[in-house]
């Protein structure tokens, strides 16, 4: 009986750990969504800025700098999207483990 209670308590601790980890990953995903949105706005800003700059006003180096900045922002957006996919995969795995915990706990309580 003591072993069953100890295992049940350990299962509960595992479940709480998984629940907290899932919430942490959810917060990270939301943070990455904000970063994606911010960097997409920066890309749009640089596109608009590039439309207003003409060769008579500035040097060609300015265009090269803007192009580099745009590429950097686009790369950041891609990196955040990849990270979000990884976080979503981890959250899905955690949800599956939590569901397995629930089913095993209900089976144990029925016995």
From Swiss-Prot:
Keyword Coiled coil: yes
Keyword Ubl conjugation: no
GO CC list: cytosol
Domain of life: Bacteria
Keywords linked to the UniProt accession: Coiled coil, Cytoplasm
Region (Disordered): 92-111
Coiled-coil segments on the chain, per record: 70-104
Location relative to the cell: Cytoplasm
Pfam families hit by this protein: DUF496
Transmembrane segments: none
Family: Belongs to the pole-localizer TmaR family.
NCBIfam families, A to Z: PRK05423.1
Function: Pole-localizer protein involved in the regulation of several cellular processes.
Descriptive protein name: Pole-localizer protein TmaR
């Amino acid at each position: 009986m003591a072993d069953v209670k100890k295992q049940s308590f350990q299962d509960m601790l595992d479940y709480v750990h998984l629940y907290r980890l899932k919430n942490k990953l959810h917060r990270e995903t939301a943070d990455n969504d904000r970063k994606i949105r911010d960097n997409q706005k920066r890309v749009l800003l640089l596109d608009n800025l590039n439309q207003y700059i003409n060769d008579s006003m500035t040097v060609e180096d300015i265009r090269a700098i803007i192009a580099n900045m745009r590429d950097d922002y686009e790369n950041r957006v891609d990196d955040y999207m990849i990270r979000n996919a990884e976080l979503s995969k981890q959250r899905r795995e955690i949800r599956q483990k939590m569901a397995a915990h629930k089913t095993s706990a209900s089976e144990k309580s029925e016995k």
